[in-house]
Amino acid sequence: MEWSQELWLLIKYLLLGLFQGFTEPIPVSSSGHLVLLQHFLGIEIEGLSFEVMVNFASLFAVIAIYRFDLLKLVKGSARYVLYQDAQGKGDFRISFYLLLATVPAVLAALLFKDWIETELKQLHVIAFALLITGMALWLIRHLNGRKQDGDITLKDALLVGLAQTAALIPGISRSGATIVAAMGLGWRQETALRFSFFLYIPISLGSGVLAISDIVQDPHFTALWIPYTIAFIGSFIASYVSLLWFMNIMRHGKLIYFALYCWLAGLIVLSLLS
């Protein structure tokens, strides 16, 4: 009996890792879906460390896919800072904008963390947030501006960073909010997508570092390190595949698919609550 329970525990965390990993890159709100999954399927997640682990897995998947672009950005920024190399000025500017755009979400998370945890993880809030995400995606479904990396302004970066704070609400997609804001400002789809996922790196890394003390003190981390590791691997693979798929969807201008899904998910949740 004990071995079957242990097997189910491993399967559960693998499925949770795959689920979170697949929903993280696409504009459907992975945090909102995780809350819905726990409520409607009665799945309990033991410990505080799980979400941090699977988010780190998604972070590594993003870095793996954009590794050459990121390496260019880091090298160019370093050349500009160390040697005042004019060729690296554009890379340094984008790096600065990414850090600046991270600030609003970090401040909002620090100021309103407890309120978000207690008040916003309500099912009706998530349902309405999904409907809003769907509407935002629908509004920009045909947009494809002309702004590339060299055309991004300080104001653009701040506005996209402010949009990212909306994703603190479960049901509002982080990638969706930032891509909608960027494309609304006239960015090209490819530029908006890349900046959105570059912006995911500091916010995810920062939240993970801040949570290290919680992980160390979490008694479940030691007891569940094998299931957590399996969830990490599953989340990495699912995030990698999901992001590549999302990039292909964006190239073909099919954001409407995600808008329809968010509407459907939001309406189903509301109907189940009524």
Curated annotation (Swiss-Prot):
It comes from the Bacteria. It is a multi-pass membrane protein. GO terms for molecular function: undecaprenyl-diphosphatase activity. GO terms for biological process: cell wall organization; peptidoglycan biosynthetic process; regulation of cell shape; response to antibiotic. PANTHER family: UNDECAPRENYL-DIPHOSPHATASE. Belongs to the UppP family. Catalyzes the dephosphorylation of undecaprenyl diphosphate (UPP). Confers resistance to bacitracin. This is Undecaprenyl-diphosphatase 1. It comes from Halalkalibacterium halodurans (strain ATCC BAA-125 / DSM 18197 / FERM 7344 / JCM 9153 / C-125).
